[in-house]
């Protein structure tokens, strides 16, 4: 699959390096992860570089990593190797977003007018070659040999091209300085104000916890160590109000890139190294005796650097992403198939909370429903039992009254005695005042039909008189027994 063409100057630089290393298959991965800054790859430490390799999927292929490292070294030492033009990529398609304020593209003036007024401007104002190439095309072919090919470096990245001819990296628009090499001190290696302020805050917090140094011990040490005394002895003799004292402290407190170190020319300090140097300088300003204890100074400076680098880079990245409305090429890429895990966790938490509330509501309603069901069952059971008990009592009472009135011996037992002999659940209170239903019906009929009352009542009484005799008269039968055996 062919890699996408670069659209910005940073992407073009990355494209050239990957093309040189035959690693164009990683171009899209670098762009997706915001890796269009080649300078970041060159200045990255070992851990940061390995992390970048893991992000683009190159960490598992060490041979590819070695080829990329070699291409980066060649890009720093010999940028002319990366000046091959892209035939399918027009120069006008590369936006210039790092031009200085005095450049003709920024000011909106023509190249010819800018050339006429260039003598009145800053003589060393420099712009990338892509802008210079456009200007040369409008001026004619007479000056086309001055500009070689498309530049790979912008003004902010010019420090990586020190010691090389300007035709290889960038051109000066001043006619007097065409072809002059870049100055080694073109960009000062120093932290910005925000990072320096963060270092100062950390030093202020740490200073009270440091042990106080004895000035007499420092003087004794300088007396015994003549070399050290010759180097930094004059700093202890300066007054605190001396404006040159801090400058001398910064000169001799530097951990990385000190004036007497054997650092390779062209290799610049990274952010970590600059932070360590700044922390060491501010610590020595607080306590000059730390100049004589570089091991302790280095440990303290590294501790401050770790804290400052993390906080400052996090704050800077967050502020830049918050202030920009347009899409940044260095923003963290979020895959479509992998949504943000925080949103997923929030959704799961809300679902779990809704489920817990629903279960709590069901648990609170469940006892009420169970009690209602139990009460309904008990009520129905009790009503059914009461109904059965009432029916049994009524039938027993009617049977007793009928048997007493129509007894064959004509004897009526006392109601109170009969009630006393019966169990409590079978006793019928006020049995004397209660009449069977058929007696009430007979009374009503006799009142309504007096002519037929006698015959009807006599028939009814005959039936009632015959019923008890047949129901309760027990005929005694003698059971014949066999004689006993005399044997």
Swiss-Prot record:
The modification Phosphoserine is found at residues 172, 183, 328, 407. The keyword Repressor applies. InterPro entries: Nab1_C (IPR006986), NAB_co-repressor_dom (IPR006989), NAB_fam (IPR039040), Nab_N (IPR006988), NCD2_sf (IPR038398). There is a cross-link at residues 333, 480 (Glycyl lysine isopeptide (Lys-Gly) (interchain with G-Cter in SUMO1)). Gene3D superfamilies: NAB conserved domain 2. Isoform Short is found in myeloid leukemia cell line KG-1. It is found in: Nucleus. One of its GO terms (molecular function) is transcription coregulator activity. Residues 221-310 are annotated as: NCD2. The keyword Nucleus applies. GO terms for biological process: endochondral ossification; myelination; negative regulation of DNA-templated transcription; regulation of DNA-templated transcription; regulation of epidermis development; Schwann cell differentiation. Belongs to the NAB family. Acts as a transcriptional repressor for zinc finger transcription factors EGR1 and EGR2. This is NGFI-A-binding protein 1.
């Amino acid at each position: 699959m062919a890699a996408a063409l670069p659209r910005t100057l940073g992407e073009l630089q990355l494209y050239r390096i990957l093309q040189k290393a035959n690693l164009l298959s990683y171009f899209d991965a670098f762009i997706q992860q915001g890796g269009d800054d080649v300078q970041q790859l060159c200045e990255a430490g070992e851990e940061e570089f390995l992390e970048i390799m893991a992000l683009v999927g190159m960490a598992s292929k060490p041979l590819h990593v070695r080829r990329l490292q070699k291409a980066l070294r060649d890009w720093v030492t010999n940028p002319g190797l990366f000046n091959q033009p892209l035939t399918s990529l027009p120069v006008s398609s590369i936006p210039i977003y790092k031009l200085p304020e005095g450049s003709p593209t920024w000011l909106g003036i023509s190249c010819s007018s800018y050339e006429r007024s260039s003598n009145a401007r800053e003589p060393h104002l420099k712009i990338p070659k892509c802008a210079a190439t456009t200007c040369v095309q409008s001026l004619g072919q007479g000056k086309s040999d001055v500009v070689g090919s498309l530049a790979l470096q912008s003004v902010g990245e010019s420090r990586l091209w020190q010691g090389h001819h300007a035709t290889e990296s960038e051109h000066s628009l001043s006619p007097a300085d065409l072809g002059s090499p870049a100055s080694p001190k073109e960009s000062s290696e120093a932290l910005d104000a925000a990072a320096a302020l963060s270092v100062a805050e950390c030093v202020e917090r740490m200073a009270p916890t440091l042990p106080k140094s004895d000035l007499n011990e420092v003087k004794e040490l300088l007396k015994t160590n003549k070399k050290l005394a010759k180097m930094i002895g004059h700093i202890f003799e300066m007054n605190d109000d001396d404006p040159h004292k801090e400058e001398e402290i910064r000169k001799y407190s530097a951990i990385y890139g000190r004036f007497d170190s054997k650092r390779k020319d062209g290799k610049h300090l990274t952010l970590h190294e600059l932070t360590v140097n700044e922390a060491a300088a501010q610590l020595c300003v607080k306590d000059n005796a730390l100049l004589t204890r570089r091991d302790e100074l280095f440990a303290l400076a590294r501790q401050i650097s770790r804290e400052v680098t993390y906080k400052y880079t996090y704050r800077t990245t967050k502020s830049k992403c918050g202030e920009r409305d347009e899409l940044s090429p260095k923003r963290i890429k979020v895959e479509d198939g992998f949504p943000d895990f925080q949103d997923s966790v929030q959704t799961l938490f809300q679902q779990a909370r809704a489920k817990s509330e629903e279960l709590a509501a069901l648990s609170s309603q469940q006892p009420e429903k169970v009690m209602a069901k139990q009460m309904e069952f008990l009520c129905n059971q009790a009503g059914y039992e009461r109904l059965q008990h009432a029916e049994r009592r009524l039938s027993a009472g009617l049977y007793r009254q009928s048997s007493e009135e129509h007894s064959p011996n004509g004897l009526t037992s006392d109601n109170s005695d009969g009630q006393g002999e019966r169990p409590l659940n079978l006793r019928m209170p006020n049995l004397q005042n209660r009449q069977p239903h058929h007696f009430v019906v007979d009374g009503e009929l006799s009142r309504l039909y007096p002519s037929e009352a006698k015959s009807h009542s006599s028939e009814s009484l005959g039936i009632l008189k015959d019923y008890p005799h047949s129901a309760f008269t027990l005929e005694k039968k003698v059971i014949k027994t066999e004689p006993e055996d005399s044997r």
